[in-house]
Swiss-Prot record:
Gene3D superfamilies, alphabetized: 6.10.250.2510, Alpha-catenin/vinculin-like (1.20.120.230)
Name of the protein this chain belongs to: Catenin alpha-1
Disruption phenotype: Embryos during somitogenesis initially show slight deformations such as indentations in the spherical morphology of the embryo, additionally ruptured weak points are evident in the external epiblast from the 12 somite stage onwards. Embryos proceed to show tissue rupture and swelling of the yolk resulting in lysis of the embryo and a complete embryonically lethal phenotype by 24hpf.
Tissue specificity statement from the Swiss-Prot or TrEMBL entry: Expressed in the skin (at protein level). Expressed in the ovary.
Keywords linked to the UniProt accession: Cell adhesion, Cell junction, Cell membrane, Cytoplasm, Cytoskeleton, Membrane, Nucleus
The keyword Cytoplasm belongs to this UniProt entry's keyword annotation: yes
GO biological process: adherens junction maintenance; cell migration; cell-cell adhesion; chordate embryonic development; tissue homeostasis
Localization terms from the record: Cell junction, Adherens junction; Cytoplasm, Cytoskeleton; Cell membrane; Cell junction
GO CC terms: actin cytoskeleton; adherens junction; catenin complex; cell cortex; cell-cell junction; microvillus; nucleus
Length: 907
């Protein structure tokens, strides 16, 4: 303990502690724990009546434990000898391990000689515990020695930071800063190594944040101190230097706490884990509404659920009442809150009606589904409200800063103070919106990053203002300008970090939807400003449109970096390029012309139609980008309330292919197949007709059998139905819309084929007739082959080309291959059903399915459809005078009905 006290280090670690704080200690300790545990469990516990004797296994295990202990002793002695810190404690710990190792060796040897003795087992268990404690203590002390070395380096950096801050001359400042830099680099390397070894994720994050602050603020301390020395009469420089130094002190404290795995008092380094509060409340509420009717109690559940919901609604109301929330969005949030309230009351009423029942009624399940849907709708409106804020606040984020710097360069301190207030409000708004985005996000890691970035931005804000005030005091000073540039760069970098972090926890779909609406609002404002000859309003709103368009391009381009290059990314990037290189320059040109014409007092006319067209193109360009991004979304992922599906009816202008789940120019792959030329459609129809013949054969075969006890018939029907859907796809019809749907259908067929193969082989294995057995196995092999073929052919591709201004769609080869593969598979299924029945008839009558360990397959003839001998006409109310179709009046001949029982030829 003397080494700790004399070093003047803030050491918060008790040397007697056995708490393991790093992965390295765990890794070193794990083999010994395993060996000791294996030895202790090598025979049954408690007294035994078995004959006493030697246990070879116990002797071997005891020897391995002793060997591991000796290994720890060698390493421990080396560490104690080489370590400059905790030498006495390490030496004592090594001796303790040696002592406990000898005790363990003796106890394990006695136990190995008499493994049935409970007394000797107990002695060995106690010795094992003591040995593990001693080894753990040694490893923890070695870990503490490493931390102690890091803390010494930290202390050295802290002292050097103080020397830089207190330097009396520029020459002294340069010397001290030059000495500081290598020490900071060394500390950073040691801290990074420690960060990797820490067990606790929170402490890892704490270390990373503190290291970042240290690296970022050291150069700023030098610049601020230099400015202080050159202009000691400017109070803002001194204030800035002190703020930076305080940040560095917090960083040093954060590294110290993280290295010792203790909590930090600084909120910027100790972010709370978990997602947003509102998101958590909604998730928890969705779980709480599902209750077992047997255990439902109105007195217990109603107050709890109502209280939780009102808490959620209070949070939603705060968001709705925020200044950036649009009026229509506010109304939607209020409406959704009322709907959620009503849905909860309906749900509670259903629970009361189902109380005491074992099973939930259909009405209760419907009420639960409706409740879940309403909370989902509320969640969506809250997300859109947050995106309103993000879209407005994270727009031209550098403008308040540039205005502030411009005022400072002019030396106008009064203006600087006014713009400083605007800048501070802007910074607070960014932080507020970032926290709002966190509140409805489930992305825990993302929320942590946003809150950390927001905290650092909050710290940087007063430093930027001080730098501007200092520049205003000495506008001609090179040092003052350099100081301002440094803080400007840091601010812009930190805002980018916060912006990217917010983008990561918000949905690009929501962002594009909201941005599209906002641009439409701004376009309308622009046109009104033009008509009212409001030059300032026109210029300001046009600037907002340019900023929104640039933000859309940035967000979408960043999102495309997450995808592999392909048709989808090409279409999206093509839309962004069109907006950036063609649409926006034209819009800017029209705005400049309009502003120039309105500013001139000579009554120069403005081409209003040209301006409106250019503005409309901006909106259309953003909308096209959004449509391109949504190409790969499924119908379930699309927000029906904000997206009109008819807008997807546009035609492709370029040559693309349907791959995976992609939509081409908003069209499904099925729709494109429907556009094939008539000659190709005729060929496909011919193939489909041939396929229908095979389908008829399968229908005739499976219709004979009752499928209630025959899985082979059930599987055959399923495969037939899926294959029909796949062939319908080639004609531009049916439920399958995209290539991914066809691929999914092929996988289902393959799964059904695999199950049929399993059933068929079980029948074949028990079939005594070798010829029947070989036939069945051959047909099963064909099913596997054709399932594989169908899987390959399912990746149907339709190509859309623009040749000489004429749209040409081609995809005949892939469609024909798909139909042919389905036809072959259908034929094999028919043959397999027949062969399975034939093989089943070969079993000896004395053997049943259970005795043969067979699956339950019962070959029973299907009863004919029940039909009345005399058709009775029902006279519905109000329908007495309705003329019946002649087919409904037709009487069924009883003999004909009985004849529908078709007997198969005996085999």
């Amino acid at each position: 303990m003397t080494s700790i006290n004399t070093a003047n280090i803030n050491f918060k670690w008790d040397p007697k502690s056995l708490e393991i704080r790093t992965l390295a200690v765990e890794r070193l300790l794990e083999p010994l724990v395993t060996q000791v545990t294996t030895l202790v469990n090598s025979s049954n516990k408690g007294p035994s009546n078995k004959k006493k004797g030697r246990s070879k296994k116990a002797h071997v295990l005891a020897a391995s434990v002793d060997e591991a202990t000796q290994n720890f002793l060698e390493k421990g002695e080396k560490i104690a000898k080489e370590s400059q810190f905790l030498k006495e404690e390490l030496t004592a710990a090594v001796e303790d391990v040696r002592k406990q190792g000898e005790s363990m060796k003796m106890a394990s040897g006695e136990f190995a000689e008499d493994p049935c003795s409970s007394v000797k087992r107990g002695n060995m268990v106690r010795a094992a515990r003591a040995l593990l404690s001693a080894v753990t203590h040694l490893l923890v002390l070695a870990d503490m020695a490493d931390v102690y070395q890091l803390l010494l380096q930290l202390k050295l950096v802290e002292e050097n930071l103080m020397k830089v801050r207190n330097a009396g001359t520029e020459q002294d400042l340069g010397i001290q800063y030059k000495a500081l830099k290598p020490e900071v680099d060394k500390l950073n390397m040691m801290a990074a190594k420690r960060q990797q070894e820490l067990k606790d994720v929170h402490h890892k994050d704490q270390m990373a944040a503190a290291r970042g602050v240290l690296q970022r603020n050291v150069p700023m301390l030098y610049t601020a101190s230099r400015a202080c020395l050159q202009h000691p009469d400017v109070a803002a420089y001194k204030a800035n230097r002190d703020l930076i130094y305080k940040q560095l002190q917090h960083a040093v404290s954060g590294i110290s706490n993280a290295a010792q795995a203790t909590s930090s008092e600084d909120s910027s380094f100790s972010q709370t884990a978990g997602g947003g509060e509102l998101a958590y409340a909604l998730n928890n509420f969705d779980k709480q509404i599902i209750v077992d009717p047997l255990s439902f109690s109105e007195e217990r559940f109603r107050p709890s659920l109502e209280e939780r919901l009102e808490s959620i609604i209070s949070g939603a109301a705060l968001m709705a009442d925020s200044s950036c929330t649009r009026d229509d969005r506010r109304e939607r949030i209020v409406a959704e809150c009322n709907s959620v309230r009503q849905a909860l009351q309906d749900l509670l009423s259903e629970y009361m009606g189902n109380a005491g029942r074992k099973e939930k009624s259909d009405a209760l399940n419907t009420a639960i589904d409706r409740m879940t849907k309403k909370t989902r709708d509320l969640r969506r409106q809250l997300r859109k409200a947050v995106m309103d804020h993000v879209s407005d606040s994270f727009l031209e984020t550098n403008v308040p800063l540039l205005v502030l710097i411009e005022a400072a360069k002019n030396g106008n301190e009064k203006e600087v103070k006014e713009y400083a207030q605007v800048f501070r409000e802007h910074a607070n708004k960014l932080i507020e919106v970032a926290n709002l985005a966190c509140s409805i996000s489930n992305n825990e890691e993302g929320v942590k990053l946003v809150r950390m970035a927001a905290s650092q931005l909050e710290t940087l804000c007063p430093q930027v203002i001080n730098a501007a005030l200092a520049l205003a005091a000495k506008p001609n000073s090179k040092v003052a300008q350099d100081n301002m540039d440094l803080f400007k760069d840091q601010w812009e970098k930190q805002v980018r970090v916060l912006t990217d972090a917010v983008d990561d926890i918000t949905s690009i779909d929501d962002f594009l939807c909201v941005s599209e609406n906002h641009i439409l609002e701004d376009v309308n404002k622009c046109v009104i400003a033009l008509q009212e000859k409001d030059v300032d309003g026109l210029d300001r709103t046009a600037g907002a449109i340019r900023g929104r368009a640039a933000r859309v391009v940035h967000v979408v381009t960043s999102e495309m970096d997450n995808y592999m290059p392909g048709v989808y990314t090409e279409k999206v990037l093509e839309a962004t390029k069109l907006l950036t290189e063609t649409v926006m320059p034209r819009f800017t040109e029209q705005v400049e012309a309009a502003v120039e014409a309105l500013s001139a007092n000579n009554g120069q006319p403005v081409d209003e139609n040209e301006f409106i067209d250019a503005s409309r193109l901006v909106y259309d360009g953003v909308r096209d980008i959004r449509k391109a991004v949504l190409m790969i979304r499924t119908p379930e992922e699309l927000d029906d309330s904000d997206f009109e599906t008819e807008d997807f009816d546009s035609r492709s202008r370029t040559s693309v292919q349907t791959e995976d789940d992609q939509l081409i120019a908003g069209q499904s792959a099925r729709a494109i197949m429907a556009q094939l030329p008539q000659e190709q459609k005729a060929k496909i129809a011919e193939q489909v007709a041939s396929f229908q013949e095979e389908k008829s054969k399968l229908d005739a075969e499976v219709s004979k059998w009752d499928d209630s006890g025959n899985d082979i018939i059930v599987l055959a029907k399923q495969m037939c139905m899926i294959m029909m859907e796949m062939t319908d796809f080639t004609r531009g019809k049916g439920p399958l819309k995209n290539t991914s749907d066809v691929i999914s259908a092929a996988k289902k067929i393959a799964e059904a084929g695999s199950r049929m193969d399993k059933l068929g082989r079980a029948i074949a294995d028990q079939c005594p007739d070798s010829a029947c057995k070989q036939d069945l196995l051959a047909y099963l092999q064909r099913i596997a082959l054709f399932c594989h073929q169908l899987n390959i052919c399912s990746k149907v591709k339709a190509e859309v080309q623009n040749l000489g201004g004429e749209l040409v769609v081609s995809g005949l080869d892939s469609a024909m291959s798909l139909i042919q593969a389905a036809k072959n598979l259908m034929n094999s299924v028919v043959s397999t059903v027949k062969a399975s029945y034939v093989a089943s008839t070969k079993y000896q009558k004395s053997q049943d399915m259970q005795s043969l360990n067979m699956p339950a397959i019962s070959w029973k003839m299907k009863a004919p459809e029940k039909k009345p001998l005399v058709k009775r006409e029902k006279l519905d109310d109000g329908q007495t005078n309705k003329v019946k179709r002649s087919s409904q009046k037709k009487h069924i001949n009883p003999v004909q009905a009985l004849s529908e029982f078709k007997a198969m030829d005996s085999i």
